[in-house]
Structure formats: C-alpha cells, structure tokens
Design a protein with these regions (language model features):
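Compositional signal for N-terminal targeting/processing segments
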Residues: 1-313
Length: 313
C-alpha cells in the first residue's frame, strides 16, 4: 500500500498538468481530494455537457443562508481536472477535508475558544510564506516565483517531491503560518487517510494544497488527532453548483486563493507551447476592436522584444 501526496496550487495550469501526468502514470485505485465531503453527491454533474467552468460549489446554512462559502473551479484548476479524471476512469474519489458541517459552525464560534480568548485575538498582517522562497531566489513575491518555477515548468519529474521539501522547510521555520483552523483540517485529513488505508487500497493519490503535504506525511499518533477533533460544533448545510467568473477568481476580488490573471492561466492551459505570438495577436485584435491602429509589424516586433527580454531575464 502506498500513499502518494501531490501538493498543488489551487488554480494553475502547470500544477494541473503535473497532477494529470502523475495520475495517468500511477493509475490510482482511490483519490482523496481536498474538498468538502458534503459535496461528493454533486460530483457526477461535472461531466454534464452544460457544466462549463468556471463554476463554484456553494455551501450554505438553510436557516441562515447568509452563512455561506464558495469553492471555485476553473478549467485549469487541478481539483477540477482530478474530478474529471476520476469520473472518466471510474476511480473512486472522496473529498477528505474537514466537513462543512463542522468548519462552517466553527466559523461562527472558534472551536475550543472562550469568549474572553476571542476578544484577545488580534489580527495580524499576513505574508505569503512562499514570499520567503521568492526572496531567496531573487523574485519579487511568492506569486511570481511559483508561476515561473511551477506553472511554466516543462518537466514534471520530481516536482511534487521538490514542492514537499520546500514546504517542509517553510513550515519548520514559520510555524505561526499554520493556523488552528488548518491544524483541525489536517487532523481530519489524516483521519480520512487512515480510514482509506484500512480499506486495502493499493495506490492512494492524495491531491491537496501544497502547504498541507508535510502534515499528511508525518502523522502524529491517532490519539492526538482524536483529541484535537473532539467536540467539534455542528450545523446543517446544503450544497449546490453555481456559475462563476474569472473576475471573481482573481486575487483582487478578495478571494484568498485567487490568482493575478485568470485569463492568462486560461490561455496557458489551452496553448502551452505558444511562444507568445498567439497571445500578442489576441491582444492586437482587442486593440483593433477599439479602433486602434495595430499592424502585423507591431505584433512581430512585440513578440520579438518579449522573447529577447525574457532571454535577458
């Protein structure tokens, strides 16, 4: 029995291709995917011809519908392609994150936290932990570092091992970046992995956010996780699919796992081998629709300049 941990970015064409290549080679007999267990019954809808991403899973509390969460998916989201792979190949797939009946109840009142302790919680300025890797490698921020080293990577060999080692180092140096909520989620994920191990699956693929991988590889004692999960609050929730947009998928919308340019990632997913010519041609077409004089010569020179600048970088 083997557990294969695939640490991903939630929306990225490179991560997406890496996951698909790994799954096709591994041929798993079970896939555990980061997501809410309550939504598993909605997964067959993914193959419906009218289901066109971007879409989102909406989970809400029926008696308080303002208490809701969204799980967006784009065509280039590793989770989306993992679901498609599982359905088309008839591989069992389970969402193994902390159930929403607990996590949404926890959002209303922190688990194992008194009213006095809640008042003492002071908001802090969040810094992407990958910013530290970016700084060491000479990049402006974690976003640009991840895009260059992972999303634009042509060779997927050992990429998941490299990501795991990088995140392990970050978590060791930055323990404060793992929140109590993440600790609860990871305890539940480990519980679901242990359950799957007892069912005699031979090749289990675990697809989750890269930050969680070290916590799922180095498991504490069962007793420790059970103690952490003891007495979780619970509410009733319902789930459904809703349409989504690339604007809402962008980081600027306030979405925590958002990306800078969803349209660019959509392009990379569909045209991974393009040298920039098609992208610039599409941009030129948009300019022409605005009655701007853009010639073929402009396109050629722009592509040439972009390629030379990229080579210098």
């Amino acid at each position: 029995m083997a557990i294969h941990l695939l640490g991903i970015r939630h929306h990225g064409p490179g991560s997406c291709r890496n996951v698909l290549e790994y799954l096709q080679e591994l041929q798993p007999d079970l896939i555990l995917l980061e997501g809410p267990a309550e939504a598993e019954t909605l997964l067959p809808c993914v193959l419906n011809e009218q289901m066109e991403p971007p879409v989102a899973l909406l989970a809400y509390q029926p008696d308080q519908p303002q208490n809701a969460v969204f799980y967006p998916f784009a065509e280039f989201s590793p989770e989306w392609q993992t679901i498609v792979y599982a359905l088309r190949n008839e591989v069992p797939l389970r969402f193994f994150d902390l159930p929403l009946v607990h996590s949404m109840a926890q959002n209303q009142k922190p688990h194992n936290t008194t009213e006095e302790q809640q008042e003492e919680i002071i908001p802090t300025v969040y810094r992407d932990p990958f910013d530290y890797l970016a700084e060491a490698a000479g990049y402006a921020d974690g976003e640009s570092w991840w895009e260059t080293t992972i999303e634009h990577r042509k060779d997927s060999a050992d990429v998941f091992q490299a990501v795991k080692e990088a995140v392990t180092a970050l978590r060791e140096e930055l323990p404060e970046h793992t929140s109590p909520r993440d600790q609860l989620r990871e305890a539940w994920m480990r519980k679901m992995i242990r359950t799957a191990q007892k069912e005699n699956f031979e090749r289990i693929a675990v697809v989750c956010g890269a930050w969680h991988v070290p916590a799922l590889e180095n498991m504490p004692k069962v007793k420790e996780d059970n103690e952490l999960l003891k007495g979780l609050p619970k509410i009733k929730i319902e789930c459904t699919w809703i349409p989504w947009t690339y604007d809402r998928l962008a980081f600027r919308s306030g979405y925590g796992a958002g990306i800078e340019s969803p349209g660019w990632y959509h392009y990379l997913w569909h045209h991974p081998q393009d040298d920039g010519t098609l992208w610039i041609s599409q941009a030129a077409s948009l300019f022409r629709k605005k009655n701007m004089d853009i010639s073929v010569a402009h396109v050629i020179e722009t592509v040439r300049l972009a390629q030379v600048t990229a080579a210098l970088r």
